Amino acid sequence: KSAFGQELQEVVHKIYNFRNPDGWKYQIRNAIALNFDTEYHKTLGTNKSNNLDGNFKSKLRLGTIFNEATIGFLGRIGFKELQPIHNSIAFNTHLNNGNTPFVRGVESFLYYETSLAYVAYDATIQGSLFNNNSPITFKPNTIRFNAEIGYKFTAKKWVFGYAYHFHSNKLNNLRNNRGNDYGQLFFSYLFR
């Protein structure tokens, strides 16, 4: 209720002339949320012209919302020389200015990313860690697979990209057991 999800969904349904959403009485109840996330990335290798690389990615999330560990791979094929991972839009680390030794270089690359996650707890499905007063909760799938393929480009302060995403189901026995897939198109501008 505190996130105003019901109100937002009702506005969207009204704009697109969809039927009124139902079922909000069954939503997961409000709870205190505190999570700690940490990530580790390592370049596994690059070619001589530095326009092709492979990177190991890992992430650990602990807290009252998510408890999960993820490992994955990100490969990039650059149309020009790739930026290192500590200065690349692939890792959202291109926020540099004149006070850093790094420059905001032009990047243009295709990428493929896969990950496998072990999920110990997901409050968005299971409800709060501290109380069990949500009317409907489920046990999540403990293993989740994600894949993404796309293109990213940046020049000066502009970032553009598009991607195709696939996520395996978070639950078993859904009407659609084939996972979720969708496209993404994004633009951004860095003010600093």
Task: Give the positions of each predicted feature.
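Conserved mixed alpha/beta catalytic, RNA-binding, or beta-rich assembly cores of soluble enzyme
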Residues: 64-88
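Membrane-embedded beta-strands of outer-membrane beta-barrel proteins
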Residues: 34-38, 71-73, 149, 185-187
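Outer membrane beta-barrel transmembrane domains
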Residues: 80-192
